[in-house]
Structures are given as structure tokens and as C-alpha cells.
Amino acid sequence: MPRRPIQKKRSVLPDPIYNSISVHMLVNRVMKNGKKSLAYKIVYNTLKNIGETTQQNPVEVFEAALENVMPKVEVQPRRRAGSVQMVPSILRSTERGQATALRWILESCEKKSAKSMVSKLQTEILDAYEKKGNAIKKKEELHKIAANNAMYSNRPQIILNAVSIVS
């Protein structure tokens, strides 16, 4: 039994304009050095531009893009018999998958060579919405690794089913 008291799960409040938790998570990920107002400007300008280009609700486009990038499995390195094996497991928590998807989207934004973060984030979200781009490639790579290493899992068939449904 742990001596430390169990930490309560921190509740994330939705953002003030779009009233969406995933948008607020994006703002917190974009924020650097505590400059939250700048992060809000970047994200809101990005969503405004997405709404103008697609003629759809920008939050729905963003959440669909997030759903497209979100992985269904994860791989964890385990040491067995002197060698390190990547053992896949299914992601049951959507928050963990969302955090991974946001991280991948922002990493691929930083690799792009555009002038502003707004334009980079907009192109990456639209690419993820159309199921192309670097973040989607990263998800497919992870699912390929999980399918190849499914034999190391306790239930390999469940891993293969989760990966094949997505692909």
C-alpha cells in the first residue's frame, strides 16, 4: 500500500470561446514560457483560418483531425531474456491518446518551414483532417510496430484487431 496519498485527477476546464476541452489542451501545448495569451492568439487565429478555408465549424474539423491522428495502441519497451522488446498494449484512455496526438501534431508543425506558427498549425490540422501529413505517418508507423510485435503482448489478437480496424 502506498504511503503517499493518491493524487486526485486534475479536471481540465474548457476554453472560454469555443467551450471545448481539446482546444484548451491544444492551447496548453502551444504555450511556451508561460505566455498563455500568445498561445490563445495562435490557436484562435488558426481555428478562424480553418473555418474560413473549409466553410465548416473549426472545432469539429480540429476534433476530427485529432481523432484521425489519435493512436489506438501504444508500445512500451520491456526487457525480456536480455533483450529489449517493444510490447504493444491498447490505449483505453482517450485523454492519453489525445495528448499523444497533440504532441505529434505540434512536433510536425515545428519541422515545417513556414513563416508563422499559425500557418504551420493550420496546414498540419488540415492535413490530419484529410488523413495525410507527418502526424498520420507517425501514427501508421506506431501501428506497424505494434502489429509486428503483437506476439509479445498478452493478447495479440486484440492488438491486431485494433490496428487493422484503424488502417
UniProtKB/Swiss-Prot annotation:
- Name the major location: plastid
List all membrane-crossing ranges: none
Q: Which GO terms describe its molecular function?
A: rRNA binding; structural constituent of ribosome
A single Gene Ontology biological process assigned to it is: translation
What keywords tag this UniProt record? Chloroplast, Plastid, Ribonucleoprotein, Ribosomal protein, RNA-binding, rRNA-binding
Kindly give the CDD domains that the UniProt entry links to this protein.
uS7_Chloroplast
Family annotation (SUPFAM superfamilies): Ribosomal protein S7
The compartments listed are: Plastid, Chloroplast
What family name appears in the similarity comment? Belongs to the universal ribosomal protein uS7 family.
Q: Which HAMAP family match?
A: Ribosomal_uS7_B
Could you identify this protein by its name? Small ribosomal subunit protein uS7c
